[in-house]
Amino acid sequence: MDSQLANPPNAFNYIESQRDEYQLSHDLTEIILQFPSTASQLSARFSRSCMKIDHCVIEYRQQVPINATGSVVVEIHDKRMTDNESLQASWTFPIRCNIDLHYFSSSFFSLKDPIPWKLYYRVSDTNVHQRTHFAKFKGKLKLSTAKHSVDIPFRAPTVKILSKQFSNKDIDFSHVDYGKWERKLIRSASLSKYGLQGPIELKPGESWASKSTIGVSHLDADSDLDSAIHPYKNLNRLGSSVLDPGDSASIIGAQRAQSNITLSIAQLNEIVRSTVNECINNNCIHVQPKSLK
């Protein structure tokens, strides 16, 4: 169901929705809020303004028996985010506790898009039947516009407990944290050697984020994932003596072939000479010269 619209706010009042009864449900069910009228939104859009929620008040008034048990969970979602990341703030309180919930937005939104904020409730661990009209909700919104967005100081959600039998120990509320942001600068091997940094050249199919995570800095080498992808990228920082693989396989093979020869060339020549002489002496018959008488 879409959020209802109402007259635009001014600096001193809030847009109030009707105090309506809601049925008990174990699933997230939308609480209808009223926002500025379509005409007011178009007027702000034509003036190229953006909008934010300065303050949101959700009034909860229970109408269950005194022995009713269970917890009510109220959540604010920003539909600009994916479904598993849209939750911005949540409150959990006893089903019998009358309470006012306060929320302060920390971001602007464009009026060219649908109003992104949605308010939901659900009931858990209760002994009250489903579809019972267990409570009334009423929303109050104070919005503002600006020519452009600015940084908004963070204000945590708060509560105002109206039932005396309950205290802060019975209430829980939370707010989403700032999104994590990590950047790593690239340093090539040649530039990091001299402490220089050069521009990053992107090629087709590459992105700034992926390109700028490649480097040889010490911080980049700390990532286990990066080390698994590029296990040898930092070998250039080792000395040449460590990187020298030694003699090649061919040199080692030749050395092994020559390892059984322990004679010098002169010794080899002497062996050949003596062998030849021995063969001549053994195979040739010496003839005594005849004398002439």
Swiss-Prot record:
Any one Pfam family match given in the protein's UniProt record, by short name: Gemini_BL1
Q: According to its UniProt entry, what is the function of this protein?
A: Transports viral genome to neighboring plant cells directly through plasmosdesmata, without any budding. The movement protein allows efficient cell to cell propagation, by bypassing the host cell wall barrier. Begomovirus genome is shuttled out of nucleus by Nuclear shuttle protein (NSP) and the movement protein transports the DNA-NSP complex to cell plasmodesmata and facilitates further movement across the cell wall.
Name the predominant localization.
Answer: host cell
Q: TM spans, by residue?
A: none
BP GO terms, sorted? exit of virus from host cell nucleus through nuclear pore; transport of virus in host, cell to cell
What name does this protein carry?
Movement protein BC1
Signal peptide span per the entry? none
What organism does the record attribute this protein to?
A: Bean golden yellow mosaic virus (isolate Puerto Rico)
InterPro entries named in the record: Gemini_BL (IPR000211)
Where is it located? Host cell membrane; Host microsome membrane; Host endoplasmic reticulum membrane
Protein family per UniProt:
Belongs to the begomovirus movement protein BC1 family.
* Bilayer topology annotation: Peripheral membrane protein
Q: How is it modified after translation?
A: Phosphorylated.
Please give the GO cellular component terms listed in this UniProt entry: host cell endoplasmic reticulum membrane; host cell plasma membrane; membrane
Complex and partners: Binds to dimeric supercoiled plasmid DNA.
Alphabetic keyword roster: DNA-binding, Host cell membrane, Host endoplasmic reticulum, Host membrane, Host microsome, Membrane, Phosphoprotein, Transport, Viral movement protein
Q: What is the superkingdom listed in this entry's lineage?
A: Viruses
Gene Ontology molecular functions: DNA binding
